Regions:
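Intrinsic low-complexity/disordered segments
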Residues: 3, 22-23
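Bacterial N-terminal signal peptides that target proteins for export
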Residues: 2-10
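Bacterial N-terminal signal peptides
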Residues: 11-20
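Scaffold/interface architecture of coatomer-like assemblies
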Residues: 24-364
């Protein structure tokens, strides 16, 4: 009886010891997980009829190599704050003749306030190697003086070139200069929308040369610029006037022309309609010629691939400076797998609006 009680007391003591030695009961833990969503920003230009419309992410359809990507956000670039653009004016004196450098810089100098109205402006001169002549600035006066100074120096060379025609750059020089441009931009990763104003000439059509190397070099550079998000504005401003603007024909005009009977003289004379020229710069005959000039084909390809434009006359600049602030920024989800470094085709549509946005054609 005593042994049994002793064992009972011993068992109770062990149990109490275990209870006293056990850690106090902790409150249930709560876990928080941070979800890392990878996004890529793409700047697009919308059709004029969608300007000012309220759009949502579901209005956009983004295809990468033909496969849809989720659009997570969409908003006008103006919501990123006043003057959100990063502007880089890149004057290549090897790719551009003195005349092109003179007229292009002079035209930009006259729009210095429009440039700085977009955002910060940096001016780079590539004599052979690129170098910054004006660090990023938002002061219109500084930008104007810098560009006017470059135009003044180019004018002296242009006047000298009237008696000594400079030889165009060789295929090797074209490729080398574009490589230097890409290397210069590779060190820059601006946040938000960014545009490259490239002062350069085109090249002679391929049949006039032994190879198509310049076209290939421009094509490859254009794809890399597009994949980096640069909006390419190619400037090859000319001396001559763009011509007298022509009013576009209305549907009624086209119908009357198509149904008119040749040689008919009966009845009253047709009414004479006075119509104002269209607001589009394509109303200027020589502006249209820019896009069919074989020598400018490399620059046109650059502008197309990057959702930019080709400027050959200063009358085109006001429309450009009015259009850039109206662009939209959309963000698409990125795959979890690491980027493979290859270039992928990019298309941005608005199916509900039956429209397609102008977007960079390539993504990396």
């Amino acid at each position: 009886m005593t042994r049994k009680r002793h064992r009972s007391l011993l068992s109770l003591a062990v149990l109490l010891a275990c209870v006293d030695g056990a850690p106090a009961q902790q409150p249930p833990q709560t876990f928080s997980e941070q979800l890392d969503i990878r996004e890529r920003e793409i700047v697009v230009a919308l059709p004029d009829n969608l300007a000012g419309k309220a759009l949502r992410p579901r209005d956009f359809q983004v295809l990468v190599d033909g496969r849809p990507r989720e659009v997570t956000r969409a908003e006008p670039v103006s919501r990123e704050g006043p003057a959100p653009w990063t502007i880089l004016v890149y004057v290549d004196r090897v790719l551009a003749s003195p005349g092109t450098v003179f007229y292009s810089n002079l035209a930009l100098a006259e729009h210095a306030r429009d440039l700085t109205g977009l955002g910060s402006v940096e001016v780079v001169l590539a004599d052979a190697d690129p170098g910054t002549v004006l660090p990023p600035s938002r002061e219109p006066r500084q930008v104007e003086q810098t560009l006017a100074g470059l135009a003044g120096k180019a004018r002296i060379e242009r006047d000298r070139a009237r008696t000594e025609v400079p030889a165009p750059p060789s295929d090797l020089q074209v490729g080398r200069q574009l490589d230097k441009l890409l290397a210069f931009l590779a060190a820059r990763h601006p946040a938000g929308p960014h545009a490259l104003f490239l002062v350069a000439d085109g090249s002679a059509p391929a049949p006039a040369r032994s190879t198509a190397a310049p076209e290939t070099a421009f094509r490859d550079a254009s794809r890399l610029l597009a994949a980096s998000g640069w909006v390419g504005v190619a400037l090859a401003v000319r001396r001559d006037a763009p011509g007298t603007p022509v009013a576009p024909k209305s549907e009624l005009d086209l119908f009357e022309e198509g149904t008119a009977t040749p040689g008919a003289t009966n009845g009253p004379p047709p009414p004479i309609r006075g119509r104002a020229p269209g607001k589009s710069t394509l109303a200027f005959p020589r502006v249209i010629d820019l896009f069919i000039d074989a020598r400018l084909a490399p620059l046109h390809a650059l502008a197309t691939a990057t959702a930019g434009t080709l400027i050959g006359y200063d009358v085109q600049l006001p429309a450009l400076f009015a259009e850039l602030p109206r662009r939209w920024a959309i963000w698409i989800s990125e795959p979890e797998a690491p980027a493979d470094g290859r270039l992928h085709t990019l298309t941005v549509r608005l199916p509900r609006r039956k429209a397609e946005a102008r977007a960079p054609q390539w993504l990396r």
